């Protein structure tokens, strides 16, 4: 019995890449033990370094200026809100934290999916909307921005490339508190 351990830094590859890597290792292993006559690995015409080089040169000049102007306009007037805490903030922030896992009941999960379907949106949008309402209640603010990761693999050629493509998208909302919440 053998055990393969893989340690990767989150800046070297994203979650999408993890799936690609595991698929490639599985194909290669099956080839080695004779379960497959074909490696079945993607023959990528580009590597991550090619994408990185292209991106650095593509996003420059007038395109970069236009994108920066878009985000400056989109986030203009936004003021960071502070959430109330149950403990005093330390003078020296060490960024330590914890993970709290919550399991939704099958019924609640189904109700949320139905709500999404009835409103012609994704479950993600329903949950993000609830998060905005919660943040608004805690912060007493109706102008909110939340960063959310996006895959950033808009080109088909990147589908099987291992690398860190994730980008963070700032999603800003201004809640209308006169609207009822469903």
Regions found by a protein language model. Give the residues of each.
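Recognition helices and adjacent regulatory flanks at domain boundaries
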Residues: 95-103, 108-111, 118-121, 126-130
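Extended, hydrophobic beta-loop-alpha segments that form or line the acyl/peptidyl-thioester binding
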Residues: 15-26, 36, 124, 142-149, ...
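Active-site-proximal acidic secondary-structure segment that organizes catalysis
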Residues: 1-47
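Hydrophobic "lid/gating" helix adjacent to the active-site nucleophile
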Residues: 83-84, 115-160, 174
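Short amphipathic alpha-helices and their capping loops
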Residues: 23, 27, 44-103, 107
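A short, structured beta-strand-centered segment in the mid-to-C-terminal lobe
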Residues: 60, 107, 136, 157-182
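A generic secondary-structure signal for well-formed alpha-helical elements
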Residues: 15, 25-36, 59-62, 75, ...
């Amino acid at each position: 019995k053998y055990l393969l351990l893989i340690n990767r830094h989150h800046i070297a590859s994203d979650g999408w890449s993890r799936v690609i890597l595991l698929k490639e290792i599985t194909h290669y292993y099956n080839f080695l033990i004779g379960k497959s006559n074909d490696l079945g690995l993607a023959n990528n015409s580009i590597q991550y370094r090619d994408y990185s080089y292209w991106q650095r040169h593509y996003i420059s000049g007038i395109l970069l200026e236009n994108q920066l102007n878009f985000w400056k306009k989109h986030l203009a007037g936004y003021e960071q809100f502070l959430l109330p805490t149950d403990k005093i903030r330390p003078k020296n922030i060490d960024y330590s934290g914890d993970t709290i896992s919550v399991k939704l009941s099958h019924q609640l999960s189904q109700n949320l999916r139905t709500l999404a379907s009835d409103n012609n949106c994704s479950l993600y949008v329903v949950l993000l909307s609830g998060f905005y309402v919660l943040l608004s209640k805690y912060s007493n603010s109706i102008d909110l921005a939340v960063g959310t990761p996006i895959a950033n693999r808009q080109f088909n050629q990147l589908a099987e490339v291992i690398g860190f493509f994730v980008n963070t998208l700032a999603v800003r909302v201004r809640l209308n508190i006169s609207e009822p919440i469903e």
